[in-house]
């Protein structure tokens, strides 16, 4: 078992009783001093010998991550045997300090689904991850869909555990050896996704077996011991999970079964007791979209852009952060004023140039106001005409709600709390057997994800979408999006009731026109919204600030 729920009860430490005070005799003091000196000498000698031994066995060069994984697969039974395992069920006894606390059942199914059920005297805790979402159902009986680092780590571990680390590249998992742990004689392999999820797996240099998993996002360390045969492969029969301060739980394997035909629905979140009409809710959300875009042009705001360059091993080679003040203007693109780069404000000279450029942009926007409005109306009419023509020919490229309703099925609609507001949450995936008739449907049919909707305001609170399969245009000659491309968007509710963008994350690997393209990892954050009518005359630019330290001039 490599996936269990992290919710554990805190355990109070026992305080030892005090020892009686006593005064040693002088002769006894000399004997104790001699014994202490002798023990210290032995300790120094043994420590030096141990250090020399460890130094001797420490490799001069670290093997590749793939070689370490291959050795692990060979040690537990070999790739051919592991490849035959489509699903697995493990039954456990749960101990807390050698005291039976409950029982557990964990299940895995390829390519990337896991589920754990922990049953205690006071209730049940269930957690799971599938290709679309990660979720928990705690002792309070309330469902909770994970987000951000916790969700990413859960989905990454599900992809690794469900396949026993076999063919991790097909799951778009990156791997690299980060260190050699001398104390435990283990190689530390970091597995990661381009979205930022990271887990460290420790493999013994002697047995080649997995001995530990370190998870910083969920603040847990899982240790594996007592490997014995179950069927045709080796499985750990003792697993210790330490969540840091909440008491370490021990899981003892009682039974393991394979290929019993576990249904995909076993890994879906529990749906709400009442019927939720997701299609009707999405149509209402769509009707609010035009109004939302119009209101968005009434606010200036700060925009923070973070771009990362990630290599094939998952290492962040370069990170660039830029912050802008943005002034939306009707019927044309917004005016963006650069404020800082990598946390350093623009210098006086450069800030003055940027201020001048922005003022010239405002002046141009004011001069061309009527012309821009006419161009915008013409663009809208042309776009509407093309959409109608493409829809008639069955080749509409615009992704809209009607397309999602045709292509997707909505899984486990449920009610949760999100950002201190009520939310309707549901997973989405392509309808089984759906055949796309245009590029829009082709793209949607390859997406999976999860959506949070505010049922009162009929607004999307959060949207996560990932490409389960690659997407190509022109047979891959024009555009080739690789599987695993991910998109996350969030909106926030202002005091006056309008919803505005809060965050956007894009992670994708794309090839354009055979030779162009690359890997893109970007996060955009919006904040400090200020309401204006959107006219140029309403904006007031602050004078450029003198930098604190000219040496930090970007």
Question: Over which residues does each language-model region extend?
Answer:
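Bacterial N-terminal signal peptides
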Residues: 33-44
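A mid-sequence, solvent-exposed acidic-amphipathic segment
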Residues: 179-215
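Beta-strand-dense domains in secreted/periplasmic systems and polymorphic toxin scaffolds
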Residues: 116, 213, 237-242, 463, ...
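Structured extracytoplasmic
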Residues: 51-184, 195, 261-262, 270-447, ...
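Signal peptide processing junction and immediate N-terminal pro/mature segment
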Residues: 42-54
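Extended, hydrophobic interaction surfaces within ordered domains
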Residues: 143, 219-269
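N-terminal secretory signal peptides that target proteins for export/translocation
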Residues: 1-29
């Amino acid at each position: 078992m490599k996936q269990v729920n992290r919710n554990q009860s805190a355990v109070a430490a026992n305080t030892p009783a005090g020892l009686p005070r006593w005064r040693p005799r002088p002769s006894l003091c000399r004997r104790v001093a001699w014994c202490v000196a002798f023990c210290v000498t032995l300790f120094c000698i043994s420590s030096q010998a141990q250090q020399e031994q460890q130094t001797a066995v420490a490799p001069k060069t670290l093997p590749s991550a793939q070689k370490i994984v291959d050795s692990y697969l060979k040690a537990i039974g070999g790739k051919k045997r592991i490849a035959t395992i489509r699903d697995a069920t493990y039954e456990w006894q749960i101990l807390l300090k050698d005291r039976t606390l409950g029982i557990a059942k964990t299940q895995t199914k390829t390519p990337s689904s896991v589920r754990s059920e922990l049953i205690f005297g006071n209730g049940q805790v269930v957690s799971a991850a599938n290709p679309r979402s990660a979720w928990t159902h705690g002792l309070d009986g309330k469902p909770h869909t994970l987000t951000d680092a916790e969700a990413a780590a859960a989905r990454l571990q599900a992809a690794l555990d469900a396949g026993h680390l076999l063919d991790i590249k097909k799951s778009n998992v990156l791997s690299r050896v980060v260190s050699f742990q001398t104390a435990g004689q283990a190689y530390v392999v970091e597995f990661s996704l381009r979205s930022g999820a990271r887990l460290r797996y420790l493999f013994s240099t002697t047995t080649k077996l997995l001995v530990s998993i370190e998870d910083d996002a969920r603040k847990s360390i899982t240790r594996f011991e007592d490997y014995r045969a179950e069927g045709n492969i080796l499985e750990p029969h003792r697993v210790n999970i330490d969540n840091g301060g909440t008491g370490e739980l021990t899981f003892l394997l009682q039974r393991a079964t394979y290929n019993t035909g576990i249904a995909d629905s076993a890994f879906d979140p529990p749906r709400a007791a009442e019927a939720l009409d997701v299609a009707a809710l999405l149509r209402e959300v769509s009707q609010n979209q035009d109004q939302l875009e119009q209101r968005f042009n009434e606010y200036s705001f700060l925009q923070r852009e973070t771009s990362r360059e990630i290599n094939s091993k998952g290492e962040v080679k370069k990170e660039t952060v830029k912050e802008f003040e943005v002034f939306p203007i009707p019927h044309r693109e917004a005016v963006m004023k650069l404020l800082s780069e990598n946390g350093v404000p623009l210098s006086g000279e450069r800030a003055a140039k940027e201020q001048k450029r922005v003022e010239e942009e405002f002046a141009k926007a004011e001069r061309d106001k009527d012309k821009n409005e006419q161009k915008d109306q013409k663009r809208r009419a042309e776009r509407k005409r093309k959409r109608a023509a493409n829809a008639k020919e069955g080749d509409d490229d615009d992704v809209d709600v009607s397309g999602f309703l045709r292509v997707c099925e909505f899984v486990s609609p449920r009610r949760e709390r999100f950002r201190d507001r009520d939310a309707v949450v549901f997973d989405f995936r392509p309808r089984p057997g759906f055949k796309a008739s245009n590029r829009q449907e082709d793209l949607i049919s390859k997406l999976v994800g999860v959506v949070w909707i505010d049922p009162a305001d009929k607004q999307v609170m959060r949207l996560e979408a990932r490409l389960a399969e690659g997407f190509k245009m022109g047979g891959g000659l024009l555009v080739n999006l690789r599987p695993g491309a991910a998109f996350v968007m969030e909106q926030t509710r202002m005091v006056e009731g309008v919803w505005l963008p809060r965050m956007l994350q894009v992670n994708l690997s794309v090839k354009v026109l055979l030779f162009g393209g690359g890997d893109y990892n970007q996060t955009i954050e919006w904040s400090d919204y200020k309401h204006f009518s959107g006219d140029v005359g309403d904006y007031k630019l602050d004078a450029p600030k003198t930098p604190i330290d000219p040496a930090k001039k970007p």
